[in-house]
């Protein structure tokens, strides 16, 4: 026994607290030890020395029984079917809570007669109760109960109370004794009771307390309750982010040290050793692993009968289509618990995804769930929706915030610090806008528009942080660590002033940023200012992460600053030794910023936490902050206040991105941007930030759900509004200004058409000098260019016709070719001859006279093409439409890949099966496409790859046909294949783990379905599970689909080898037959044969072969 265990036993002996949970534990212990209740009060963990085992001391019978409980002997989906009694109890409880669940349960009842009976029984009980009430009400109002009636009613109440007493679980009123190293707070005890009630009613749930309220401790306490009170030792699976693996292990060691916790992590060999020697041998209670490890080790984890699956940061599975969500749904578990501080991020469909994971038998249809919360405009309907949402969420969701439950934790003070830009930042910001001025003005296509705008947004946000994030911006080489790191970024100027003040006050600071390269700059800054620091980002190893956290949190640590990336450092890290959080930039998802703040603002924090969020004023970051406030307000309305309207996703659309980019852009070009200098007063900046933060919060707190559904929650702003002015084109009497680069303005005569002016007018721009009375001439519409996909097989003649049409249009509008048309460089584009001549001089200076002459020659050639372009006639237009109709314009990429896959699966000549496999096209369409495809295959980019895939599929198909034929012929030669079929095993087959009967069964099943059958090996698995031959054959019943496919492949290889070497195998066949005819059945196989109808007990098999492999049943070896 360890010293730690002796100390714990000594502590528990001296403890005399008598909580209800402890009484129950003591009762259970007294039954096993034969002692009285009074002797065991407060000794929930004290067992006799004989009963306190180490792993090695446990008797073999204990491990055998434990392994039987931990490891499934059937497929998880069949094991789930055995839990129907839990399902009925769960349904009955939920129907008692609210009749709204009948909508969901009614769907399940259509396929389950027992659920139908349950619903009828509940309806019958309700009708009886209704009739009794109606009878009483219809009688005289002076009617008094007789003694007999009252006695009957009292007896019924007593009986019901007795039943409830036996069924009700013990209510925990204070911190239970099995929780060591501290006590649960009152609200944590309430959370433990809530988890216990979920367990008793066979429900899964979502523990959604605000970050920092001790969700980890509540979960560990609940698992301790299951272990020490309910005698459920496990197995429990806890899936957490990689960064919190060690934190969870430490928490278990601290609060419930006697629980056997295993962390599944490491390289492939290490994990394989853990799975083989610990997990599958049931030598653990709680398994902690990461999301990535669950995906990699799914086959091993799927074999255990989990009592609980706990998922930390459960919003990771909000997408039910993700790999993690789908894999975890395959696991067997009695119950599931989700832990998240952010239950709602975007919309209610994500909340449904979490509920669907917890209770798939109830929340199986997302459309039905969404229909519940469709909301009309009337206030009465809104009230009904709110009530419905509360009724649905109450049994599953527990959500509490710090302000309501944790009175000792001071509220954090958040301040948005609005910062101007330095001259260098302004210059880079303008340059980024000018680089893609068309996109800034909204002149982007639908297909590439959002990606193009996202790229601009990313670059602008980098500029707001520090211009040195761009290659070539930092002066050098040589590169120096000097004051220029600070005075070239507005945020760095304010950070420098703020950190100096915090250092004097004795505060300690966490600095978060999305960009790890910015942390590099901050590292240089800390080195320059002699600030001791730690750092964590996405590339930090698990060991280095733990070391950095311990170093920062140790008593009297010299570390002043902790640098973290928002995503890598915002999960599961306890840094309460810091009292100041600086968000250098804001995450798109406001919940990520909240998680970052709560690394310091959590239980255990004794100081007031200040959060400073840096925001670049009059730039894109202001819009990002408004977007974050909108999302947080939505969370507050839907979850914390119960407003249940179905909400549209608040993702960033193209208009949203455009609005962010345009915000403050005009001020940049007009030299009105907010500036900051080294002399800025930090007090004035903080005071201004506090005021603007209060205004922003007040604005969004006053908004309702309908207001939040608008673009950005303020009045009727759209993507065309910035600086309080609307630039959207409303009518002809108000012409909108186009945002022009600061370098120059373009001047063109209005008497001729210009393509640039034409597009400006279409998008919403125009000339300042346009008057209300002078109508502008309408520019002709540019002809649409069809850019077809290569697999759509447009006729080659179409390209020539489209070029002819484009040249004719340019000739018609007097289009002048510029250097931009040749080089694609906006710096070379001119608007008149004078500008072009000046640019030619610049080109000559930079690239030489030869480059200038070549550019001029190419411009002249292109202009000559336009000037001499022939007319595009009506006949040309008709011919163009005719050519377009010949292309396969209704075939998309998905249809094309479906055709390729079908050709690979069935062979290019099997048109019947190819037609059937493409559901989106008629058989005639597929046939016509196939003909053109094989004629013009080489016109497709990467045609060699597609052809190679088809040829590989055809070869595989031929091989399968050949194997099918050999197998069928071999089986047809036997009158009773299961008895007489002979498999020619190789001479060296000592490692073979399948016996002859299992191999024969697999071959007969494959012959039954065919090698090319869909889901062949799932069908084989089903045949094995349903066959009486293998009732007690644990080995074959626990083979996975992948293992069965490998075995079938090996057997087919043996059959092919037998066919290819007939002479060599002929002698073997005769010897084997002679031996097997004289060999009696093994006792095991004889018993199986007698239990199967029409299976003679004289089935010929090899007894020696069977006996050799009996001892190998529990091994999973690699096959030869």
From Swiss-Prot:
Modification Phosphothreonine occurs at: 1079
Gene Ontology cellular component list: CHRAC; chromatin; chromosome, telomeric region; nuclear microtubule; nucleus
Record text on subunit structure and interactions: Component of the ISW2 complex, which at least consists of ISW2, ITC1, DLS1 and DPB4. May form a stable subcomplex with ITC1.
Alphabetical list of SMART domains matching this protein: DEXDc, HELICc, SANT
Domain SANT: from-to ranges: 886-938
Region (Disordered): 1-58, 129-153, 764-783, 828-853, 1062-1120
EC number: 3.6.4.-
Modification sites for Phosphoserine: 17, 19, 831, 1082
Transmembrane segments: none
Protein name: ISWI chromatin-remodeling complex ATPase ISW2
Compositional bias segments (type: Polar residues): 1080-1104
Span(s) of short sequence motif DEAH box: 312-315
Comment field (misc): Present with 1520 molecules/cell in log phase SD medium.
Domain Helicase ATP-binding: 196-361
Keywords: ATP-binding, Chromatin regulator, DNA-binding, Helicase, Hydrolase, Nucleotide-binding, Nucleus, Phosphoprotein, Repressor, Transcription, Transcription regulation
Top-rank lineage group of the source organism: Eukaryota
Main location: nucleus
Family of the protein in this entry: Belongs to the SNF2/RAD54 helicase family. ISWI subfamily.
One GO BP annotation of this record: termination of RNA polymerase II transcription
SUPFAM superfamilies named among the record's database cross-references: HAND domain of the nucleosome remodeling ATPase ISWI, Homeodomain-like, P-loop containing nucleoside triphosphate hydrolases
Database matches in InterPro entries: Helicase_ATP-bd, Helicase_C-like, Homeodomain-like_sf, Isw1/2_DEXHc, ISWI_HAND-dom, ISWI_HAND-dom_sf, P-loop_NTPase, SANT/Myb
